[in-house]
């Protein structure tokens, strides 16, 4: 069981039960969220309760840590790279698991003028949006920047596998700049290989996408203010993606 969970525990005394539940819940819902496993020995369950003042958690306690923000300096660099690009693409995977991320990604993509490829492990972007390029491998052939947000398997959408020969070829140009926002190696397990081939990135920001996306949007909006050249380039990029939709 330990190989499949973030944390497992078996209390050996009734006094440890409330604390184990507090730790289990906090561990489970802290991003990257994952399952926990708790079990109780039959002896402990059947033993007569003799403790008269079992300490329970206070009502005003914070049940889990606040989400982790991404480094603003790295986000600023990412904004510069994307705004200077000709054909930037945002690759998204699991961000749809948090309420509100759907709308945050739409705002981010429209602000930056990026095409968006939703890997569809969790619905993250509307497929009727003009910037949606999911399953359009031709759009990746011109990508000069790819920003992955909460992506686990980079190779699946960006490469082609010939099943008969096991040959793998990339849809993306060799000089493409790769960047990442998400939990990266925090999601890794020493046992489970539920991740794809490692993709080297030029810029990586460790942080929760629910905070990083609006922050990156805000940074980009500041850079776009009173800069007609950047705005014109952004709008031109968006038209290229929308014309393919």
Language-model-derived ranges and their functions:
Residues 92-183, 187:
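Glycine-rich, anion-gripping cofactor-binding loops and their flanking helix/strand elements
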Residues 15, 39-40, 174-245:
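Phosphate/pyrophosphate-binding active-site segments
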Residues 19, 69-70, 98:
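Structural/interface elements that position substrates and couple domains in central-metabolism enzymes
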Residues 14-15, 64-70, 123-127:
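Short, flexible loop segments at the rims of nucleotide/cofactor-binding pockets, characterized by
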């Amino acid at each position: 069981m330990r190989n499949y969970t973030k944390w497992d525990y078996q209390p050996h005394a009734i006094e440890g039960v409330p604390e184990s539940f507090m730790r289990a819940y906090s561990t489970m819902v802290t991003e990257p969220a994952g399952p926990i496993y708790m079990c109780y020995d039959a002896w402990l369950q059947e033993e007569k309760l003799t403790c008269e003042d079992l300490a329970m958690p206070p009502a005003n306690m914070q049940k889990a840590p606040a989400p982790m923000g991404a480094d603003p300096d790295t986000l600023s660099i990412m904004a510069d790279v994307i705004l200077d690009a000709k054909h930037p693409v945002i690759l998204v995977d699991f961000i749809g698991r948090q309420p509100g991320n759907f709308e945050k990604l739409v705002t981010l993509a429209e602000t930056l003028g990026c095409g968006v490829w939703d890997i569809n492990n969790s619905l993250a972007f509307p497929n009727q949006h003009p910037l949606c390029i999911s399953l359009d491998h031709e759009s990746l052939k011109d990508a000069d920047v790819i920003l992955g947000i909460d992506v686990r398997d980079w190779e699946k959408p960006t490469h082609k596998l010939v099943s008969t020969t096991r040959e793998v070829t990339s849809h993306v140009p060799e000089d493409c700049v790769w960047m990442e926002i998400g939990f990266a190696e925090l999601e890794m397990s020493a046992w489970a290989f539920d991740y794809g081939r490692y993709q080297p990135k030029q810029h990586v920001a460790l942080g929760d996408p629910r905070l990083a996306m609006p922050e990156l949007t805000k940074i980009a909006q500041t850079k776009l203010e009173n800069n007609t050249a950047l705005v014109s380039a952004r709008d031109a990029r968006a038209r290229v993606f929308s014309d393919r939709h």
